[in-house]
Design a protein with these regions (language model features):
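Short S/T/G/P-rich N-terminal loop/turn motif that feeds into the first structured element of a domain
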Residues: 1-71, 78-87
Length: 87
C-alpha cells in the first residue's frame, strides 16, 4: 500500500531530522516492510514523504513509537493512505 506522510518538525531543522532518519540503525527498524520511499523538504522544518508499506501492522506499531517520541519534541505527523484513481 502507498502512503503519504507530512511531518511538521517543530523547532528541528530538516537537515537534523534527515540525518537522524537515515542513520543505519534507524533504517534497519524499517527494513523488510517499508520502501521504496521518496523524501522531500517542505519548508524550513517540514517533510513530505511517499512510501510503500507492505505490512500495515508494523506501520501501526512503528507509528505509535514515533508519535510518542515526536510529541515530546514538538513534532506532528499526518498519514494519508493513497488509493488509485481511475480517472
Amino acid at each position: 500500500m502507498n502512503y503519504a506522510f507530512h511531518i511538521h518538525l517543530g523547532d528541528m531543522p530538516y537537515e537534523t531530522w534527515y540525518e537522524m532518519y537515515t542513520k543505519p540503525e534507524n533504517a534497519q527498524k524499517r527494513a523488510g516492510w517499508w520502501g521504496p520511499e521518496h523524501i522531500g523538504k517542505s519548508g524550513p522544518n517540514g517533510v513530505v514523504m511517499l512510501a510503500q508499506v507492505s505490512d500495515e501492522e508494523k506501520l501501526t506499531e512503528h507509528m505509535k513509537f514515533v508519535r510518542e517520541m515526536a510529541s515530546k519534541m514538538g513534532m506532528h505527523h499526518k498519514i494519508y493512505k493513497l488509493a488509485p484513481d481511475s480517472r
